[in-house]
């Protein structure tokens, strides 16, 4: 029965990985027209608008009290607010390769947090497979080249804080999905992202005296296409898929699927953007896939029941 209930969760996790993996292509398109924080602001504006439409038409019913918002607020601040903010500021001082290596450790951080907070007890083989998937991602970024001399302590710290925010979100969301409806969690997360990133972007534009250019990127059809994908699919839909998956399987298992998006990004870059695909990409991808599958399968005879039961 449990395995049958978990099947949709794994489908959701795979779909989540594909959407996130492809999102990097649309981020590249959006960056040709707008600044990173403007992109974040616009994508969560689209996400919040898309989440509000079915509520206005009565297709989705929400029964959110002020107390519920206060309870969910810390979760929404961890992701998307803190995760994307630390990441965006961190990338100003760090290379994408350095950031990729640090954020590859998110499943390990999640495993540690989940062990203490949720009492999740992965087996030693699951721990080993998780480390293997992390090593696969790190191997790819290391082989691509990391400029150690230009590495910034400030940038590394900000990226680390971004990774910790994601790990804490995975852990907290696992518990919150047992208390609140997935639509409620997703809606409030979108609302917080909308408020936080628009505030940051407008303050930055206000300081630079460029508020009048805030919506200029929407003149470009390519930007509109990219921001709709990032807002509706990569923000709203993935938030729902992530919350759904975390309501069914352990946090450390879901976290491992983040690495699958790395493979999707590599394949999409190779097929669509004609980017090179070297042997170390393939070697790393094999390690990632073996690690993700292995971390989600218990190969030991005795299975310790996870601390957080699956939501029925």
UniProtKB/Swiss-Prot annotation:
> Which parts of the sequence belong to the EamA domain?
18-142, 164-297
Please state what the protein is called: Uncharacterized transporter YcxC
The record's annotation in InterPro entries points to:
AA-Vitamin_Transporters (IPR050638), EamA_dom (IPR000620)
Q: Where do the TM regions start and end? A: 11-31, 46-66, 72-92, 98-118, 128-148, 155-171, 183-203, 221-241, 254-274, 277-297
The signal peptide annotation in the UniProt record is none
Its annotated compartments are: Cell membrane
Give the source species: Bacillus subtilis (strain 168)
Organism lineage reads as: Bacteria, Bacillati, Bacillota, Bacilli, Bacillales
Q: Keyword Transmembrane helix, does the record have it?
A: yes
Does this UniProt record's set of keywords contain Repeat? yes
